[in-house]
Amino acid sequence: IRFALHKFNMETQDALEQCARFAKSKREKFSFAGTKDKRGITTQWVTAYKVPLESIAKVNGKIPCLFVGPAAYVKEPLRIGALSGNRFTIVLRNIPFELSEDVIGASVRAWAQLGFINYFGLQRFGTTSVPTHAVGCKLIKGDWKGAVDTILAPRAGDYPDVAKARQLWIDGDGEGAMRDMPYHMRRERDVLHTMVRQGKNEEGVWVGSEDALASLPYSLRTMYCHGYQSYVWNRVVSARLDTLGLSPVVGDLVEIPPSEEQAAETAAAVAAAAAAASGSQARRYGKKVFIRTHVRALTADDIASAQYKMADVLVPLPGYDIQYPPNMLAKYKEIMAEDGITSALCDGALVCRLTVTPSYPLPLIASLTLAPSPPSLPLSIHFA
């Protein structure tokens, strides 16, 4: 089924945990196209596999910051990245009174005309003192124990009962941490459950780290790794602008049309994925097809021709089988080396088939369309 998820002051993953709990289902059965900001008032489509329509509505009226809207049966699940964009209503506060409406309007229109740096924001990194990319870095290195310890590490802003449970883990009392960790801390409880079940070895070291991570939803594990990719991307983009300026330069990447042979390969991959989607597992989890964006590095002749703008410049997320911009390759290596990651970033598999996958290069400069229109997702709230 597909339904509209409306939330505020709640992470997407936490909202889906609550939906699964009230529907008496598993979190792994729910999928979505992208995470939404915790601090925003957001609405997005979510799909759920073999979850009754009537069970989804049970969440309404139970949690003040979470509602679900109309639900209907669909043929395919949503997949991460399966969206063309987001629609925002943005509120700007504390604007100086001395600024005229004309000045404010011109500033807003400039966003649409000139664009803005396409940074990843807090929805990718989280809002706690232990960001998602810190866990992702450990996963990419295969440091399973480090990843578990990072997930369970104390953080600023924890409620007293959560802080107590985290401290018990640090003190080596896994059983006590499991006992005191509140039930709504699902990911921490899932990790602790496996760690306590598998116990310690003769040297007193916990042995279940890899299995504990495998107990987490696949989408959460990939989110951790995507967080690290995004962290590197943000730093590379900042370095690119600081050192090379606000105009295209030699070595920047731009998209080029695929050749006939490349287009045929893409069509064959899509057809193969469609054929594979006939199986029950494919219907449940979806089959992701990576359609390569063909790029090339700008030359001195390209710069002299002045045919490219900053909006044409693409910057790839780090991963395997990636074409990096020659003018920033050293910066990618430098940033990842700080975290103990070599340039062979995730050439192999991560825990439970988790890999840092190839991805579309992202525009360095993002554009904004200013056009008033009604919300694209209807929301109808019904309380039981």
For the regions a protein language model found, what residue spans apply to each?
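Non-catalytic, substrate/partner-engaging modules appended to enzymatic cores
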Residues: 1-384
